[in-house]
């Protein structure tokens, strides 16, 4: 039973639950609770439907959205779904006096397809494709929506698409979900459906410095939809903090009109094939001319995925413990933090090795060595061979065929991309992506010229247009984010300028290997490039 108004209009219920239920359990069911002020603002969008009688909350949790609605309008009939029995029992206790709230212990994605609702409001579970029954749920979507989606689609977007399908005439939908789908490959088909449905009205990107959801490392967006045929426009907005939530009120109160902003587009203007951050975030690339896709000069692929780093990675102590000869170990950078500067040398590798860091991968195909056989049997007894990746390999303990890449690039970043020249010529795990120069341009563009360019702020800023944003300023780049990202067309540089950059690069390398600061040199390279490629400049 909700005993006081205070419990309704804040997150004390969620805080009490989080204290009593383990983080492991909450993560298992993707329970990351929405701050009440955000839930309240989203509820206003639902309540803006003057014909509102029925509301659906597809992922009920502890009913923060229902509380937000009931605190503003008590006579609404609410139906809700929840799959976790623990939180379901808690929620039933809180809502047992509300006859107009019906909570069902059922999976929303497999139930209730034929019913329509005047309002649907939700913070759906954030599960990646391998964390839920994606084949069967995608089949449900395909059958009911006549929409075929990518097998890598995240569960939260499937909740959204089903809810849009269930809107009654003039019905409204408010979702808070990770922004990831706006800028990911699997999101293309989701965005296509949103455009085709013509229900999308607002995407409000929450650019908080702090995380919106406790314990969840993600950037969120509020998606507002309406099945009212009133407009063919969509508006993108950014809010920077909880103090800016009044902007959401302004957006809702203005509807069906929109705020005065350049970030308003017709459905026909939206391209589902591109990253939608182009619609809500200023693009760095517009400051430059003569840009080409990075894939023109190089290809980015992920590092080696073992399927079990604990089993496959080795240091000298582990090799000694299991009597594994070094000929069966592949030199590899196993931790991103072990490469500390822009150059990773053979000396760096030897120092890590002597420090007993993990710098090898088990690599023993076709060996008859009895110690190798014993270690393989150990893996099988621990069922390493049945893991998601290893189960599809023959033999299961074989490594992916990845030649050492001349350049590594960091996957996650807070202060811009890190590029590292792999002078030790060793392999890398997935904490770095591999950059391999295209064979057809090797004779045209020196690999050192490419690397010198990648070290500049200009290169990093242009790539930023293609990044994926997470909480607390964290950025992530998948290989295709970089492949499809833009870069200055270095092939247009004359020999004199190329030589000038390469000479500066040699100076920079000397300083770094001598443990000195080389920022001033990189700034000089940056200035040469911006002088050449700035939109305001003209080529000689």
Swiss-Prot record:
UniProt entry keywords in alphabetical sequence: DNA-binding, Methyltransferase, Restriction system, S-adenosyl-L-methionine, Transferase
Protein family per UniProt: Belongs to the N(4)/N(6)-methyltransferase family.
GO molecular function: DNA binding; site-specific DNA-methyltransferase (adenine-specific) activity
Claim: Transferase is one of the keywords in the record: yes
Database matches in CDD domains: AdoMet_MTases
Gene3D superfamilies in alphabetical order: Vaccinia Virus protein VP39
Pfam families: Eco57I
Quaternary structure and partners: Monomer.
SUPFAM superfamilies in UniProt: S-adenosyl-L-methionine-dependent methyltransferases
Protein name according to UniProt: Type II methyltransferase M.AccI
Signal peptide start and end residues: none
Reactions that this protein is recorded to catalyse: a 2'-deoxyadenosine in DNA + S-adenosyl-L-methionine = an N(6)-methyl-2'-deoxyadenosine in DNA + S-adenosyl-L-homocysteine + H(+)
E.C. numbers: 2.1.1.72
GO BP field: DNA restriction-modification system; methylation
Keyword Transferase: yes
């Amino acid at each position: 039973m909700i005993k006081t108004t205070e419990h309704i209009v804040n997150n004390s219920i969620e805080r009490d639950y989080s204290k009593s239920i383990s983080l492991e359990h909450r993560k298992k069911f993707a329970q990351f609770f929405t701050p009440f002020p955000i839930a309240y603002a989203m509820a206003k969008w639902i309540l803006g439907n003057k014909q509102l009688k029925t509301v659906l909350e597809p992922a009920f949790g502890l009913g923060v959205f229902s509380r937000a609605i009931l605190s503003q309008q008590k006579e609404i009939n609410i139906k809700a779904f929840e799959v976790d029995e623990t939180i379901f029992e808690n929620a039933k206790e809180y809502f047992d006096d509300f006859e107009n709230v019906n909570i069902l212990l059922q999976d929303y994605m497999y139930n209730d397809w034929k019913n329509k609702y005047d309002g649907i409001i939700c913070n759906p579970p954030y599960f990646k494709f391998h964390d839920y029954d994606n084949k069967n749920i995608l089949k449900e979507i395909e059958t009911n929506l006549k929409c075929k989606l990518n097998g890598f689609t995240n569960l939260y977007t499937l909740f959204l698409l089903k809810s849009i399908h269930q809107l009654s005439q003039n019905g409204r939908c408010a979702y808070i979900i990770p922004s990831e789908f706006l800028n990911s490959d699997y999101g293309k088909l989701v965005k296509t459906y949103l455009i085709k449905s013509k229900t999308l009205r607002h995407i409000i990107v929450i650019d908080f410095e702090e995380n919106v959801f406790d314990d969840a490392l993600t950037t969120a967006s509020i998606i507002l939809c309406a099945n009212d045929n009133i407009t063919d426009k969509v508006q993108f907005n950014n809010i920077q903090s909880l103090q800016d939530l009044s902007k959401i009120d302004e957006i809702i109160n203005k509807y069906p009109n929109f705020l005065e902003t350049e970030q308003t587009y017709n459905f026909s203007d939206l391209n589902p094939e591109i990253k939608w951050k182009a619609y809500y975030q200023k693009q760095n690339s517009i400051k430059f001319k003569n840009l080409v896709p990075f894939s023109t000069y190089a290809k980015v692929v992920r590092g080696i995925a073992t399927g079990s780093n604990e089993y496959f990675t080795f240091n000298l102590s582990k090799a000694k413990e299991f009597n594994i000869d070094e000929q069966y170990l592949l030199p590899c950078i196993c931790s991103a933090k072990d490469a500390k500067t822009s150059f990773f040398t053979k000396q760096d590798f030897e120092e890590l090795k002597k420090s007993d860091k993990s710098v090898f991968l088990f690599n023993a195909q076709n060996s008859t060595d009895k110690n190798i056989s014993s270690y393989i049997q150990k893996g099988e007894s621990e069922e390493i061979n049945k893991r998601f990746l290893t189960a599809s390999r023959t033999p299961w303990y074989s490594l992916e065929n990845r030649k050492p890449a001349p350049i590594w690039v960091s996957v996650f970043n807070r202060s811009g991309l890190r590029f590292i020249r792999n002078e030790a010529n060793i392999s890398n795990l997935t904490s770095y992506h591999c950059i391999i120069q295209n064979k057809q341009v090797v004779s045209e563009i020196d690999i050192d010229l490419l690397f010198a360019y990648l070290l500049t702020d200009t290169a990093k800023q242009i790539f930023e247009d293609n990044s994926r944003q997470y909480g607390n300023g964290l950025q992530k780049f998948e290989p295709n984010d970089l492949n499809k990202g833009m870069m200055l067309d270095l092939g247009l540089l004359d020999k004199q300028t190329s030589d000038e950059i390469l000479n500066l690069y040699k100076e920079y390398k000397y300083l770094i290997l001598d443990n000195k600061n080389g920022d001033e040199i990189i700034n000089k390279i940056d200035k040469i490039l911006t002088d050449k490629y700035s939109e305001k400049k003209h080529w000689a």
